């Protein structure tokens, strides 16, 4: 929970508790009479809420600090090796999450958070399509990200393919998770193509480019819809699996960039990546896998 919100709620509830002590013993006001009758219930519930909020904050505080540390560390990697001449580069950590969790997150964001925007731009149909409805599947979601320059918060998700054993993947991250080895891709740039529209409505030239991009980036044809959720479609991609101490795959780190020039992240980071991954793996070792 945001620390500022927690502090504000604590102050409000503390004021309520203090105000209860100042109530007059006798009053003709119906509301004050009701409060006087239930004063101990109100005080008890208010105190319980304050305590519960602090317990929740303590429970979630560790993960919040881990995220802050990881963002700082990702910034170090980017600034040290990938910033400057390599512009528009992002480095992200994606984690595996259960489908029902992603369902509620996507429902809240695409429907409730964008409620006014959906009415204004008549985008209800696309928003409903963007909800993660496969609640029994696993998804990859953005856990932390640092980009140069800074980008907006991402709500993209990638459903892990049920046919990965037949080389039917939902992108390079899915392939990296399934095979447990780093993956690197440099392919055609399709960032200028509007992939929010159905594939059939693309021009023949655009279809050709999108097919090539999906093939090279390990998107099976059935996962064309995944492109619509991506704020930026990069053509230089480097994925490295994140394995915990028990050798289970927790997620994947992705470095991506949009450029006609090949950005060989795998080669550039080869002398350092092993040490960096050990630090990331250790930082995430105290968290649950999903």
Where are these regions (language model features)?
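Juxtamembrane interface helix immediately N-terminal to a transmembrane segment
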Residues: 1-15
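Regulatory sensory and allosteric helical modules in signal-transduction proteins
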Residues: 120-230
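Juxtamembrane "helix-exit" motif on the non-cytosolic side of transmembrane helices
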Residues: 19-30
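Juxtadomain coupling helices with adjacent low-complexity linkers
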Residues: 246-290
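Intrinsically disordered, low-complexity terminal regulatory regions
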Residues: 28-164
